[in-house]
């Protein structure tokens, strides 16, 4: 069981900022920006390469919800970045697909 499943089951506390039937968003405990939220499906999708065509609707709704989450957290106007890390070289540390929403400061390009 991943840490995200434990958070979804309320076995581990988290600052949840948004929740729907099949995904939720919470503040990252090790933020990399003033606003750093993880948007996570409640069921495990083991990384982006573990997604299947049937996941498209869920993943699309997670992306669409990011604009509401950004608005709620006060970064919709100034701007925010969405990131999906996939694999060790990208920094993926939990084998459960999730989207990082980062904002509250200027983001450099290229990242990393």
Question: Predicted regions: what is each one?
Answer:
Residues 1-112:
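HIT superfamily nucleotide-processing domains
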């Amino acid at each position: 069981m991943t840490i995200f499943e434990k958070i979804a089951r309320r076995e581990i506390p988290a600052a949840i900022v948004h929740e729907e039937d099949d995904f939720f968003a919470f503040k990252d405990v090790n933020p990399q920006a003033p606003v750093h939220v993880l948007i996570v499906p409640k069921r495990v999708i083991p990384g982006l390469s573990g997604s299947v065509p049937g996941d498209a609707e869920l993943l699309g709704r997670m992306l669409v919800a990011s604009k509401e989450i950004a608005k709620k957290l006060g970064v919709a106007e100034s701007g925010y970045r969405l990131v999906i890390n996939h694999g060790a070289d990208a920094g993926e540390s939990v084998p459960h697909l999730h989207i990082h929403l980062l904002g509250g400061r200027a983001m450099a390009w290229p990242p990393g």
